[in-house]
Amino acid sequence: MIFLDNRQDKIEVTDKLEKIVTSSIECALKEEKVNFPCEISVVFVDNENIKDINRENRNIDRVTDVLSFPMLEYPESKVFKEVYLNYKFPEYDMNDGNLVLGDIVVSLEKCEEQSREFGHSFFRETCYLIVHSVLHLLGYDHTEDSDKKIMREREEYILKKAKL
C-alpha cells in the first residue's frame, strides 16, 4: 500500500505524477524482491518544509531533495533481500497485514530545480529520488564509495526497468 500526501502548493501534484511515483515504488520493490504486502508513505513538501524536517531529524540546517525514514533495521552493508527475504515478521512491524517499510519526504520544489540543473524531466528527477529513497528504506546506503556504486547501479537498473 502506497500513501501519497501532498503538503505543498508550489508544484501541482497531477494524476500523472501520482501514477509515475507509485509505479516507480512498485518497480523498486519488485526488483528488490520484496514479496510481502507492504506500506510506504510519500509526503510531498516544498523546500522550506524539507529544510525544517532535515534540521529537526538530522541537525542539518539546509534544503535537501529527499529524506528517508526506514522502519526496519539492517546489519551493516546488508539490504532487505539479504536479511528479510524469508523472514517471518512480528505483528509490530505490520499494519493491517502490510509490512511497514517507512516514510519518504520529497521536496517537489527541489525536484523541479534539479531537473533543470541536470537537463532531464521533472518526472524523471522525481522518480529517481523516489527510487533512491525506497532503496534507503530497503537498507541501501551511500556513505562508503563501494556502497554508493552499488546503490547507484541499482537506481539506474530500476529506472530502466520502470522505463524512466
Swiss-Prot record:
Protein name, entry field: Endoribonuclease YbeY
The cofactor note reads: Binds 1 zinc ion.
Which organism was this protein described from? Clostridium kluyveri (strain ATCC 8527 / DSM 555 / NBRC 12016 / NCIMB 10680 / K1)
Q: Where, in this chain's numbering, is Zn(2+) bound?
A: 132, 136, 142
Localization of this protein: Cytoplasm
UniProt xrefs under NCBIfam families:
rRNA maturation RNase YbeY (TIGR00043)
Signal peptide segment: none
Q: Which PANTHER family match?
A: ENDORIBONUCLEASE YBEY, CHLOROPLASTIC
Which InterPro entries would you find in this protein's record?
Answer: MetalPrtase_cat_dom_sf_prd, YbeY, YbeY_CS
Q: Which cofactor does it need?
A: Zn(2+)
Family statement drawn from the similarity comment of this UniProt entry: Belongs to the endoribonuclease YbeY family.
**Gene that specifies this protein:** ybeY
Q: Which E.C. number(s) belong to this protein?
A: 3.1.-.-
Q: Which GO terms describe its cellular component?
A: cytoplasm
Role, per record: Single strand-specific metallo-endoribonuclease involved in late-stage 70S ribosome quality control and in maturation of the 3' terminus of the 16S rRNA.
Keywords recorded for this protein, A-Z: Cytoplasm, Endonuclease, Hydrolase, Metal-binding, Nuclease, Ribosome biogenesis, rRNA processing, Zinc
A Pfam family for this UniProt protein? YbeY
> Per the UniProt entry, what are the Gene Ontology biological process annotations, in alphabetical order?
rRNA processing
Cited SUPFAM superfamilies: Metalloproteases ('zincins'), catalytic domain (SSF55486)
Give one GO term, molecular function aspect: metalloendopeptidase activity
